[in-house]
Amino acid sequence: MLPTNRNRPQQRPARSWYFISDMDFSDPKRKPRYLSKILMVALLTAMCVVMLTQPPCHRRTPSVFSIHEPGVTHVLVTGGAGYIGSHAALRLLKDSFRVTIVDNLSRGNMGAIKVLQNLFSEPGRLQFIYADLGDPKAVNRIFAENAFDAVMHFAAVAYVGESTLEPLRYYHNITSNTLVVLEAMAAHNVRTLIYSSTCATYGEPEKMPITEGTPQFPINPYGKAKKMAEDIILDFSKSKKADMAVMILRYFNVIGSDPEGRLGEAPKPELREHGRISGACFDAALGIIPGLKVKGTDYETPDGTCVRDYIDVTDLVDAHVKALNKAERGKVGIYNVGTGKGRSVKEFVEACKKATGVDIKVDYFPRRPGDYAEVYSDPAKINSELNWTAQHTDLLESLRVAWTWQKKHRSGYGPPQAMVL
């Protein structure tokens, strides 16, 4: 029989746990706290085991857009939901470029993005990011999360008349936002920029046609804002650490649409009064507006109306792609993109009547502030250096192609609720 000693009970020594400091289970007040620590350690250990043992297919893999892939050029297209930007994205995708579109949809159309996504649905071809270039943090994050090889910068408000009414908006949207893009490019080592500029930077030159050497004296906030953006780009490109490939394309009045009828021009309803003359002609032909308003009949031109160089959007985006392919680090190229032939507004309206088959009502009004009498290009430099020549120079045919799209899309790309991704 084992001896007992009830009068002198022996105290059991407290266990020590080497992985938790100050552990003393002999103290009942501390026991709950110690148990919670043990449970937390066990939980963290279990989580680590699960993460390390799960199959590779369940682990998050980097997006293809965040990786530089040999043989694939990844182009950021700002304003890619807009009229010109969407056509440029279409051409890039057709030519097997990888494309990221950034747009805040203030002027662009989600419908154009949807068309492109349906055409190029293969993984790694196209992504759309909703963002405002006026937000430096958002822009920097986009550059940090994506491996861009080049930027085509289209995003901008672009109506001469509107710029005279809201000049500060134009300087902020065009000039300031271009600076934001440049800073992000510099921070993330993206060295190729194709910049969408305008003949409006020349103002009202004394001599025609306009060459790249024609002095730039813009006469409206739109042209001035673009000129400032050009100056910023050129100054930065000259700095030793920039080492950039820069192409600045100053283009003239854009018309037309995708020849296959996939994309077209669809300005927001509230902006139609500021829009291009082709859009106004089509709206009049469709009965959306009662007639066409021609502003200015007393210019020093053959028929008193403004003379412009009308460039088809298909030719314009071809110039951008050729500029991208020819861009070289440490070099800057500046090119006019036009047909080299001027047409008066009256000529344009007559061509639009023929293209639509509608006898459009025309009303004449005084000049619009900020407009200039005559502007057309000398495309010799771009012809020679980029081997680019406008192919769609038949004004009537360009208008017919655009009219085909407009007839099928009276409300643009459709109601917003039908375009949610």
Swiss-Prot record:
Membrane topology (Cytoplasmic):
1-33
Q: Where are the transmembrane segments?
A: 34-53
State a single Pfam family of this protein: GDP_Man_Dehyd
Q: Which residues lie on this side of the membrane: Lumenal?
A: 54-421
Task: Provide the cofactor list for this protein.
Answer: NAD(+)
Provide a GO CC annotation, any one: Golgi cisterna membrane
> Which pathway, metabolic or otherwise, does it act in?
Nucleotide-sugar biosynthesis; UDP-L-arabinose biosynthesis; UDP-L-arabinose from UDP-alpha-D-xylose: step 1/1; Cell wall biogenesis; cell wall polysaccharide biosynthesis
> Which keywords label this protein?
Carbohydrate metabolism, Golgi apparatus, Isomerase, Membrane, NAD, Signal-anchor, Transmembrane, Transmembrane helix
Q: Which InterPro entries does the record associate with it?
A: NAD(P)-bd_dom, NAD(P)-bd_dom_sf, UDP_G4E
Q: Name one GO molecular function term.
A: UDP-arabinose 4-epimerase activity
Where it sits in the cell: the answer is: Golgi apparatus, Golgi stack membrane
Q: Enumerate the catalysed reactions.
A: UDP-beta-L-arabinopyranose = UDP-alpha-D-xylose
Q: How does it sit in the membrane?
A: Single-pass type II membrane protein
Major subcellular site: Golgi
**The enzyme's E.C. designation:** 5.1.3.5
Residues the entry annotates as binding NAD(+) = 74-105
Q: Which residues form the active site?
A: 222
Q: Could you give a single Gene Ontology term from the biological process aspect? A: capsule polysaccharide biosynthetic process
- Protein family (similarity comment): Belongs to the NAD(P)-dependent epimerase/dehydratase family.
UniProt-recorded name of the protein: Probable UDP-arabinose 4-epimerase 1
Q: Which organism is it from?
A: Oryza sativa subsp. japonica (Rice)
This protein's encoding gene: UEL-1
